Each structure stands twice: as structure tokens, then as C-alpha cells.
Amino acid sequence: MNKLAIEIVTPNGSIYSETEAELIVLQTESGEMGVMAGHIPTVAPLKIGAVRVTKPGNDKDYIAVTEGFAEIRPQQVSVLVQAAEQAEGIDIERAKESLKRAEARLNEDKAAHVDFHRAERALHRAINRIEVAKFR
């Protein structure tokens, strides 16, 4: 089976790199997208979600990502996002605290001038981190 390289990059640098991927699954704005070697060149907007990388032997890596873009070429996928964490690096307790804070902000009185869009994004990020951490 042909292999595919993937790199996940944030403004702070490369977070994840793999050169032997068999399948990469991305959460795009239009739905889940599976990418294998030889995929047609594409640029896809990503939503908050998990990137799943299947390696030889059916080993899988899971990476929680925020919104961003994926540039897909026949032998390479470049994921550009604001933040990303590998499942092994996620502090579940910290993610649960973030979830509680986001829920509290969303439940505040509208007179408090809460930025609901920002609070909702924080809620989705926290939920995603907790879900991805389950794959450690």
C-alpha cells in the first residue's frame, strides 16, 4: 500500500509529523474526509475535531485540532490550525475545567455581554479534547 506523509502545524510550529500514513481522516466543514495516497490536490477548511492517522499495522494516532485548513496533495497532507494536541498530551482534568468554564459563560445572563460565539467555540474545543483523549 502506498504511504502518505502528514504534518500538523500551528503558529508555534510542527505538532505532529508522520511519513508512513495509510489513511488520514479529517473533519472538514462539509463532513468527514478520508485521504489516501494519490488523492487529488485539494484545499479543505477544517472544523474543530479529531484528525485520525492510520499507520501500518492498523496503529492509529489521534490529534485534536481547532479550525484551520488542510492542503492535500497526492503524497502529502499539510494541516494548518491555530491549536493541536496529540491524544497522549491532553490533560483530561484541564479539559474538563475548560468545559465547565465554557458552559458557565454560555449560561450567564445576556446582560453580561458574553461573547457567545467565542464561548461556544471554547465549549466545542473542550469537548473535542476530552473525546480525543479517550484514544490514548
Swiss-Prot record:
Recorded topology in the membrane: Peripheral membrane protein
Entry GO terms, CC: plasma membrane; proton-transporting ATP synthase complex
Residue pairs linked by disulfide bridges in the UniProt entry: none
SUPFAM superfamilies hit by this protein: Epsilon subunit of F1F0-ATP synthase C-terminal domain, Epsilon subunit of F1F0-ATP synthase N-terminal domain
Alphabetized GO MF terms: ATP binding; proton-transporting ATP synthase activity, rotational mechanism
Main localization of the protein described in the UniProt heading: membrane
Taxonomy, superkingdom: Bacteria
Subcellular localization(s) per the UniProt record: Cell membrane
This protein's UniProt keywords: ATP synthesis, Cell membrane, CF(1), Hydrogen ion transport, Ion transport, Membrane, Transport
PANTHER family for this protein: ATP SYNTHASE DELTA/EPSILON CHAIN, ATP SYNTHASE EPSILON CHAIN, CHLOROPLASTIC
Complex and partners: F-type ATPases have 2 components, CF(1) - the catalytic core - and CF(0) - the membrane proton channel. CF(1) has five subunits: alpha(3), beta(3), gamma(1), delta(1), epsilon(1). CF(0) has three main subunits: a, b and c.
Function in brief: Produces ATP from ADP in the presence of a proton gradient across the membrane.
Family (UniProt): Belongs to the ATPase epsilon chain family.
Name of the protein described by the UniProt record: ATP synthase epsilon chain
Organism listed in the record: Macrococcus caseolyticus (strain JCSC5402)
